[in-house]
Amino acid sequence: MFFQKEIETMKRSELEALQLERLKWTVDYCYKNVPFYTKKLDEAGISADKIKSLSDIKYIPPTTKADLRDNYPFGLFARPMKEMVRIHASSGTTGKPTVVGYTKHDLDLWSDCVARIAAAAGATDEDIVQISFGYGMFTGALGLHYGLEKLGATVVPNSSGNTEKALMYMRDFGTTALVATPSYALYMCETAKELDYPMSDYKLRLGLFGSEGCTPEMRTQIEKGWGLFATDNYGMSELMGPGVSGCLLYTSPSPRDGA
């Protein structure tokens, strides 16, 4: 499944040419708009015109966690605050949170990326998708929310918690796809069984899981418990959020199909 087929099926040579063009543009843009990067790139002796191939990325000084914290909250923003329409932040469990600002254009690109990984996982505009990530400063819930809406799916923004009500919505709305952490998806399944809810009442066929690791054993439990096909996706607040990558293992049909 594709959302933007012309991009997702691009020839390798064309993709690398596009990546090089955008790498050079990004370096030049950061140099001109973020004083921190002006200084850092000057010290490294690197500029956009010196980048001749993708392998030259090794000459670009990395941005560290310390850099993000030292420039908290808005020191690395490349656009004026009046253009920011949303701000997200990491949890900051080991220090100051990583703060990310989004322009309208950023949000549009972000939703494109999420729509791509959702489509690659098998989501379509016919799906009813229940989001059981917690909404808030965390990028996961709103990231998947807007990407799935762009794909054309019907989104149920249930959030996390109140599991019994979430199960009621899932059954009554005919939810076909679930966005959650793997552990919460498993907990929901166990709760449904404890409440003696017939699993045949549920129409789940796809799981879009993330925000934590998932062992093969846990994945198997979720797939067998719900009768869905479980996929994982990856993201980080420093790079918008979910949509960076989607992991899909083409191993077998869904357990719902008798695999």
Where do the model's predicted regions map?
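AMP-binding/adenylate-forming
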Residues: V100, K104-I117, I128-Y187
